[in-house]
Amino acid sequence: MSDILNKIVAVKREEIAAAQKKIPLAAMRADAESRVLTRDFEGALRAKIAAGQAAVIAEIKKASPSKGVIRENFIPADIAQSYAEGNGKVSAACLSVLTDRQFFQGQPDYLKQARASCALPVLRKDFMVDAYQIYESRAMGADAILLIAACLEDAQMAEFEAIAHSLGMAALVEVHDGAELDRALKLRTPLVGINNRNLRTFEVSLDTTVSLRKAVPSDRLLVAESGILTPQDVKTLRDADVHAFLVGEAFMRAQEPGAALAKLFA
């Protein structure tokens, strides 16, 4: 792992230890297992694609380590509603909400607020390094979790995926290169995200998705992540047979995020 990833993972482990002192694993698991109604994250993406539209996972993100504060006027419920409405014709399929506090200025309440304000399935965007977080994700209302291959061993990914599926959640596994993709394809989840941002250098290139696309089997649903800022970026990816996208920064900088989404994917 890179220095920044090592730092993030170390902080996560501290956060998990503190959280378990407040709510032990057994109690968190019981809470998660009591929440039986999830929204169909994968189904929402596939429905958009079947309708000939882009399947957009629209991100709610206040800040990032590389860009600092991205959106000052940050009201998750309003942003979620804007994404869900779009322009009436083009809108988000799902939401992604940052819950990491230290590096992205997120928090679990943002996910709860966003989910309560619309009917879209919600992905918890955070760095999962312990089974406790998977139960915690469902307890806070998440319909899907992110598994970042660069942060996890194969056994951890398989364990976390199994827990997520047992709770009715989807798992989006994120990769950046061919070796990580090979590992991701061993999992059961059909959701594979290719991050165009190198988490070691934070450099961004759409060529990452384009070059790896051919290695993704047709039964998997490929999601392009990061660096999608212009209609030409969207065209480049669509020409490579990519139909699902995770976009955040481009929308967060717009006064009306849903309108920006509709314009980008018109």
UniProtKB/Swiss-Prot annotation:
UniProt pathway annotation: Amino-acid biosynthesis; L-tryptophan biosynthesis; L-tryptophan from chorismate: step 4/5
InterPro entries documented for this protein: Aldolase_TIM (IPR013785), Indole-3-glycerol_P_synth (IPR045186), Indole-3-glycerol_P_synth_dom (IPR013798), Indole-3-GlycerolPSynthase_CS (IPR001468), RibuloseP-bd_barrel (IPR011060)
One Gene Ontology molecular-function label: indole-3-glycerol-phosphate synthase activity
Catalytic activity: 1-(2-carboxyphenylamino)-1-deoxy-D-ribulose 5-phosphate + H(+) = (1S,2R)-1-C-(indol-3-yl)glycerol 3-phosphate + CO2 + H2O
A Pfam family of this chain: IGPS
Family: Belongs to the TrpC family.
Protein name from the UniProt record: Indole-3-glycerol phosphate synthase
Originating organism: Paracidovorax citrulli (strain AAC00-1) (Acidovorax citrulli)
Top-level taxonomy: Bacteria, Pseudomonadati, Pseudomonadota, Betaproteobacteria, Burkholderiales
Gene name as annotated: trpC
